[in-house]
Amino acid sequence: MPITRMRMRPWLEMQINSNQIPGLIWINKEEMIFQIPWKHAAKHGWDINKDACLFRSWAIHTGRYKAGEKEPDPKTWKANFRCAMNSLPDIEEVKDQSRNKGSSAVRVYRMLPPLTKSQRKERKSKSSRDARSKAKKKPYGEYSPDTFSDGLSSSTLPDDHSNYTVRSYMGQDLDIERTLTPALSPCGVSSTLPNWSIPVEIVPDSTSDLYNFQVSPMPSTSEAATDEDEEGKLTEDIMKLLEQTGWQQTSVDGKGYLLNEPGAQPTSVYGEFSCKEEPEVDSPGGYIGLISSDMKNMDPSLLDSLLTPVRLPSIQAIPCAP
C-alpha cells in the first residue's frame, strides 16, 4: 500500500499558519498571497536551519530525505520544491512582487480558489491542445526533455487501456516474403547411401592377337652335360695337335735352339692347320679363345687354296738352356 500524504497546498497552508519557518508569512491572507524566502546559496551562503528549513521539511514530508541516513543536500531540496510549486494548478506566482536579487530575495505566490471538476477538465484539455499545437509548430530538433515531460504530465489518458492494441503486420510481411522469395524445391534428407560400384572390364588393346602366356622350359642336365663334353673334347684335340708338332734342334752362333717349321711334317699324316691368336677376352671360363680347325680329313687341294692368302708369321729362334 502506498503511503498517503497530505497534498502540497494544504501542507503549505499549515506551514504558513504555524509561523515556525522564518520568512514564510501571509502578505494578504484575504487574497491568499504569501511569500517564501528564496535566498541564493551560491552568492550569499546558506544557513540550513534558517534559509533552507522549508525545503528540508518538504523533502522529509515526501520521503526523499531522512535525517541520519543521507547527507543534507539543500540545492536538491530547493529544486524539488520549485518543481512541485510549478506543477500546482491552483497556485501561481505574482512576479511583479517577487524579489530575486540580494540576501533578502523572496518569491510571492497567490493561492487560487479550488477548481471544480468541469474547470479541471477544461484546463487539462486546453493544456493538451496547447501541447499538440506546440509539437506541430516546433521542428524535431527543438524538443527538450522538459517540454516532453510537461506534455506527458498535462495530457489526459483514459483509465481503461484495454482498447490499446498494436496493429499486427505479420501476415503482410509473410505475404511480401513469399512473393519476393523464389519457389524452392523441398529438401529431403535420407539416411541411406547408394552403393558406389563401378564395373571394371580389362580388355587388351588389340583383340586380334591373343597369345597364351608361356614359360620356356629349363635345360635338362643331360643337355648341359653334352655341352661340357664337347668343350672338353675340343680342348683335348688342341692339346694333341700341339704335342704332335715337331720341334727340331738347331744351333746358331754356337747356341742351341728348338725350331718348329710349319709344313715340316707330312701333310698326309697330320694335315696343315693355322692357329690365330685372339686378344684376351674376359669370359666366365677364364680361358683364351683359340680359333682352330681339325684338318685331318680335309682335301689337300682345298687346304692349299685356303692357306695361300694367309701370311705366315715370322719364325723366331727359341734359345735353349745351356
Curated annotation (Swiss-Prot):
Keyword entries, A-Z: Acetylation, Activator, Antiviral defense, Cytoplasm, DNA-binding, Immunity, Innate immunity, Isopeptide bond, Nucleus, Phosphoprotein, Repressor, Transcription, Transcription regulation, Tumor suppressor, Ubl conjugation
Biological process according to GO? apoptotic process; defense response to virus; immune system process; negative regulation of DNA-templated transcription; negative regulation of regulatory T cell differentiation; positive regulation of DNA-templated transcription; positive regulation of interferon-beta production; positive regulation of transcription by RNA polymerase II
User: Is Transcription tagged as a keyword?
Assistant: yes
Q: Where is the composition biased (Polar residues)?
A: 146-157
Under the heading PROSITE patterns, the entry gives: IRF_1 (PS00601), IRF_2 (PS51507)
Q: Name one GO cellular component term.
A: cytoplasm
Residues within the DNA-binding region(s): 5-113
Activity regulation: the record says: Activated by MYD88.
Task: Locate the N6-acetyllysine modifications and list their residues.
Answer: 78
Q: Which GO terms describe its molecular function?
A: DNA-binding transcription factor activity, RNA polymerase II-specific; RNA polymerase II cis-regulatory region sequence-specific DNA binding; transcription cis-regulatory region binding
**SUPFAM superfamilies on file:** Winged helix' DNA-binding domain
**Which PANTHER family does the annotation name?**
INTERFERON REGULATORY FACTOR, INTERFERON REGULATORY FACTOR 1
What does this chain do?
Answer: Transcriptional regulator which displays a remarkable functional diversity in the regulation of cellular responses. Regulates transcription of IFN and IFN-inducible genes, host response to viral and bacterial infections, regulation of many genes expressed during hematopoiesis, inflammation, immune responses and cell proliferation and differentiation, regulation of the cell cycle and induction of growth arrest and programmed cell death following DNA damage.
Q: What is this protein's record name?
A: Interferon regulatory factor 1
